[in-house]
């Protein structure tokens, strides 16, 4: 792992943008994208940049079950608001949170991922070490699947909803094996609340109890952390 410790999210986003620009210049054609607060500044810098994605495909990590584009809290809505409306891609794929047959939807998405191997994957990390919506205990060999969200994840995401009771309890997520197939992974984490998860990811045992710890087994992982998130690293 390569670790960049930065002073704030803008500085972290600048580091990530520089890496992305280098990869695009080197022929990257498929981006794996994440939602949540960690990549917001990164997406802002992309919107303000001269980068062109007309020949680039994107695939997103996950989507809430039961939410579609009309919902402000769906991830398709998030991506359109924060990136796609300004920087359209050749193709953009997300799981369909309104699919009536979730098993068929996971199979459809796995096929998309097989057809579009990810060159550059952006990740955040949950306080419990989840990546995507792969909660503790998720198998390292897992593919796209239906997830029962952990209480800590539901609690963490409640701030995005007017009514905490409206937070979805399920999601469709890429599996850990899907994530690990990316050629380059850039994980961004900011804030003291992420410090324990980062320590376990970087310095702990590789265990399914800490999903992000599997990144120790990847050949090209870059962590972008602020000083608070990095504060417990030795």
Curated annotation (Swiss-Prot):
GO biological process: carbohydrate metabolic process; glucosamine catabolic process; N-acetylglucosamine catabolic process; N-acetylneuraminate catabolic process
Keyword check for Transport: no
Reaction(s) this enzyme catalyzes, per UniProt: alpha-D-glucosamine 6-phosphate + H2O = beta-D-fructose 6-phosphate + NH4(+)
Key words, A-Z: Carbohydrate metabolism, Hydrolase
Pathway listed: Amino-sugar metabolism; N-acetylneuraminate degradation; D-fructose 6-phosphate from N-acetylneuraminate: step 5/5
Active site, per annotation: 62 (proton acceptor), 128 (for ring-opening step), 130 (proton acceptor), 135 (for ring-opening step)
Pfam families documented for this protein: Glucosamine_iso
GO MF term list: glucosamine-6-phosphate deaminase activity; identical protein binding
EC number: 3.5.99.6
GO terms for cellular component: cytoplasm
SUPFAM superfamilies listed in its UniProt record: NagB/RpiA/CoA transferase-like (SSF100950)
UniProt key word Hydrolase: yes
Role description: Catalyzes the reversible isomerization-deamination of glucosamine 6-phosphate (GlcN6P) to form fructose 6-phosphate (Fru6P) and ammonium ion.
Entry-linked HAMAP family: GlcN6P_deamin
Recorded family membership: Belongs to the glucosamine/galactosamine-6-phosphate isomerase family. NagB subfamily.
Protein name from the UniProt record: Glucosamine-6-phosphate deaminase
Gene this protein is translated from: nagB
């Amino acid at each position: 792992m390569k670790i960049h410790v930065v002073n704030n999210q803008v500085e972290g986003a600048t580091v990530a943008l520089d890496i992305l620009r280098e990869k695009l210049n080197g022929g990257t054609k498929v981006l794996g994208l994440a939602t949540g607060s960690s990549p917001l500044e990164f997406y802002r810098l992309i919107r303000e940049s001269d980068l062109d994605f007309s020949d680039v495909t994107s695939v997103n990590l996950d989507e809430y079950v039961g939410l579609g584009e009309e919902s402000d809290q769906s991830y398709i809505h998030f991506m359109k608001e924060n990136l796609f409306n300004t920087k359209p891609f050749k193709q953009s794929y997300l799981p369909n949170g309104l699919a009536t047959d979730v098993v068929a939807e996971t199979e459809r998405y796995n096929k998309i991922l097989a057809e579009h191997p990810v060159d550059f994957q952006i990740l955040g990390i949950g306080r419990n070490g989840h990546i995507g919506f792969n909660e503790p205990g998720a198998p390292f060999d897992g593919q796209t699947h239906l997830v029962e969200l952990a209480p800590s994840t539901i609690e963490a995401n409640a701030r995005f909803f007017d009514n905490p009771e409206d937070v979805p309890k399920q999601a469709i997520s890429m599996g850990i094996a899907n994530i690990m197939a990316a050629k380059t992974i850039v994980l961004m984490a900011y804030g003291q609340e992420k410090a324990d998860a980062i320590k376990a990811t970087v310095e702990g045992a590789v265990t399914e109890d800490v999903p992000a710890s599997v990144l120790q087994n990847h050949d090209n992982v870059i962590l972008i952390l602020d000083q608070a998130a990095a504060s417990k690293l030795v």
